[in-house]
Swiss-Prot record:
NCBIfam families: rpsG_bact. One of its GO terms (cellular component) is small ribosomal subunit. GO terms for biological process: translation. The keyword Membrane does not apply. This is Small ribosomal subunit protein uS7. Signal peptide: none annotated. Keywords: Ribonucleoprotein, Ribosomal protein, RNA-binding, rRNA-binding, tRNA-binding. The gene is rpsG.
Amino acid sequence: MSRRRRSERREVIADPRFGSETLARFVNMLMVSGKKSIAEKIVYGALDHIEAKTSQNSLEVLNKALENVQPVVEVKSRRVGGATYQVPIEVRPARRMALGMRWLIDAARKRGEKGMVMKLAAEVLDAKESRGSAVKKREDTHRMAEANKAFSHYRW
């Protein structure tokens, strides 16, 4: 184990357009090679597209989509006497948010639409309606945890 103290969680500066810390984290996760302005253009473009398509507040739509993608439980490998068990554990709120964002962005990148703005907008709208690849990933994770519920007494 590390001899150093636990690292402190850095504060994220809220994004300038909506004043949302969650959205700022989302932009930072989408960013590739430090190109934040491009990531912001993509996210804001997707949010504008969502607002035009649904005539709802795009930030609320994004938050609902993230809520539908965030996992409640996940499995972690635990080695006991030569056998490796997939032990279901609850996900901490900060990790839950991070996983939800990561899965949403990964699912958007794999979509077939033209341009990342359209891909992200489509994936967020799908996630809001509880469908799409990101929601499927969450369901698979929950199914895995449910299947390995018998090993939950191996928690640490």
